[in-house]
């Protein structure tokens, strides 16, 4: 159990049979009446966001989440298969569970999988990955005066905006949080 006074951004709670993550919170102490905590909660399963108010000191169950490092071994149809390298247990995830992390996932890459019981809530990739450019337009000489960018397709199929000097076959570093180009490798 956790008190509403202890809510912080990122705190996970169980409410109505679901896991919710505190996105925003505000402790309010009105001049008249009792204090309360106004929160914005995001459902960890569906992604929906709701606003909820709790009385100050109200206790709610804290969600017990387990984070396990697993390796992406292969893709079976439309499912992504991950293996726990300690217990050799497999977890099969569909594209909806993967979210945007599917754009930067390579075979044999390790990722942190967040579980609530036996249900997968989130896939957390490393903050940056090295990917090979498989498709991009050739850069034109003298076209760099403005420091422009061009679209490039990387080995996972994701599109990344890269500087004009990047060519096919080069390895680049990509931020998995927003898909931005970080540099050459």
UniProtKB/Swiss-Prot annotation:
Signal peptide segment: none
Keywords from UniProt, A to Z, are: Cytoplasm, Elongation factor, Protein biosynthesis
Q: In which pathway does it act?
A: Protein biosynthesis; polypeptide chain elongation
Tell me if Transferase is a UniProt keyword of this record.
no
Q: Which GO terms describe its biological process?
A: peptide biosynthetic process
Entry superkingdom = Bacteria
Q: What Pfam family is a match for this entry?
A: EFP_N
Task: Report the subcellular localization.
Answer: Cytoplasm
Does this entry carry the keyword Protein biosynthesis?
A: yes
Q: Which GO terms describe its molecular function?
A: translation elongation factor activity
Report the principal subcellular site: cytoplasm
**GO CC term (a single one):** cytoplasm
Q: Which InterPro entries match?
A: Elong-fact-P_C (IPR015365), NA-bd_OB-fold (IPR012340), Rib_uL2_dom2 (IPR014722), Transl_elong_fac_P/YeiP (IPR020599), Transl_elong_KOW-like (IPR013185), Transl_elong_P/YeiP_cen (IPR001059), Transl_elong_P/YeiP_CS (IPR013852), Transl_elongation_fac_P (IPR011768)
Protein function = Involved in peptide bond synthesis. Stimulates efficient translation and peptide-bond synthesis on native or reconstituted 70S ribosomes in vitro. Probably functions indirectly by altering the affinity of the ribosome for aminoacyl-tRNA, thus increasing their reactivity as acceptors for peptidyl transferase.
User: Which family is annotated?
Assistant: Belongs to the elongation factor P family.
**Could you tell me what this protein is called?**
Elongation factor P
**Organism encoding this protein:** Rippkaea orientalis (strain PCC 8801 / RF-1) (Cyanothece sp. (strain PCC 8801))
């Amino acid at each position: 159990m956790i008190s509403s006074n202890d809510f912080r951004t990122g705190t996970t709670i169980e409410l109505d049979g679901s896991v919710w993550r505190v996105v925003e919170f505000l402790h309010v102490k009105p001049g008249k009446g009792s204090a309360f905590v106004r929160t914005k909660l995001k459902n960890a399963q569906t992604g929906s966001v709701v606003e909820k108010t709790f009385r100050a000191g109200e206790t709610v169950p804290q969600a017990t989440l387990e984070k396990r490092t697993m390796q992406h071994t292969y893709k079976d149809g439309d499912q992504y298969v991950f293996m726990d390298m300690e217990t050799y247990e497999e977890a099969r995830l569909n594209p909806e569970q993967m979210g945007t992390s599917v754009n930067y996932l390579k075979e044999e890459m390790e990722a942190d999988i967040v579980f609530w019981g036996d249900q997968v809530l989130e896939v957390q990739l490393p903050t940056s990955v090295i990917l090979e450019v498989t498709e991009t337009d050739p850069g034109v000489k003298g076209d760099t005066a403005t420091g422009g960018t061009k679209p490039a397709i990387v080995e996972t199929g994701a599109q990344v905006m890269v500087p004009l000097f990047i060519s096919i076959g080069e390895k680049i570093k990509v931020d998995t949080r927003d898909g931005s180009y970080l540099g050459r490798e």
